[in-house]
Amino acid sequence: MRCFKATIAYDGAYFLGYAKQPNKLGVQDKIESALNALGIKSVVVAAGRTDKGVHANNQTLSFHAPKHWNAAKLFYCLAPKLAPHIVLKKLEEKNFHARFDAQKRAYRYLLTKNLKTPFLAPYIACGDYGSLDALNTALKQFTGKHDFSLFKKEGGATTNPKRAIFNAFAYKTFIIGHECVVFKIIGDAFLRSSVRLIIQACVQYSLEKITLAEIEMQIHNLKATIRTPIMANGLYLHRVYY
């Protein structure tokens, strides 16, 4: 068997998340079904499992295929079976593990105050976010290594809730005629819905609905003020570092 590394992008609006689902509507379901149609039976491992509605620009996968498959032939056969909602960007033969070998993961979140067309609604979140300075002040609280037990969705079990965030900041830009705030958060790994809970906390602070002290208390597992993640549609798994 040969091990392959695949880089894909996908539209999270068409899936119930990355992980396999009982109704077969997960990204993993689609990829494994496409491989199975080619006679390849393999579990597909992802660098990170995104939630329902979350997109990916550069998700990384690892899987195995029989030796008669090479990267060029497999790319040619597999890419059309994934389209249009999953795009196979790159495929190479590489002996690695997509999840365990990943060193850092970068997420981006797009948020605008006024969405001018419904056609962008699945891809840019809409809502007030206060001031850019306040957002960056709040984001700074999350850098470093912390126990993120109170920044994960219920049911997101893990044996080790400690994660390191290397960089977290926000900036403004225009995307298809919309002024947006783009959040960028880079960490070694993230718990379930952790990125969206972090961004929600920062937005609520910027809107003066919570204080920095309340954010710090939640980071230190003293009290959970933010329990509901910000909407999923603005979030993108942007890059995985190896």
UniProtKB/Swiss-Prot annotation:
UniProt keyword terms in alphabetical order: Isomerase, tRNA processing
Pfam families xrefs: PseudoU_synth_1 (PF01416)
Single GO BP term: tRNA pseudouridine synthesis
Free-text function comment from the UniProt entry: Formation of pseudouridine at positions 38, 39 and 40 in the anticodon stem and loop of transfer RNAs.
Enzyme class: isomerase
The protein's name: tRNA pseudouridine synthase A
UniProt-annotated catalytic positions: D51
Ranges in a coiled coil: none
Gene Ontology terms for molecular function: RNA binding; tRNA pseudouridine(38-40) synthase activity
InterPro entries in alphabetical order: PsdUridine_synth_cat_dom_sf (IPR020103), PsdUridine_synth_TruA (IPR001406), PsdUridine_synth_TruA_a/b_dom (IPR020097), PsdUridine_synth_TruA_C (IPR020095), TruA/RsuA/RluB/E/F_N (IPR020094)
Family: Belongs to the tRNA pseudouridine synthase TruA family.
Record's subunit section: Homodimer.
EC nos: 5.4.99.12
Catalytic reactions of this protein: uridine(38/39/40) in tRNA = pseudouridine(38/39/40) in tRNA
Binding site for substrate: Y107
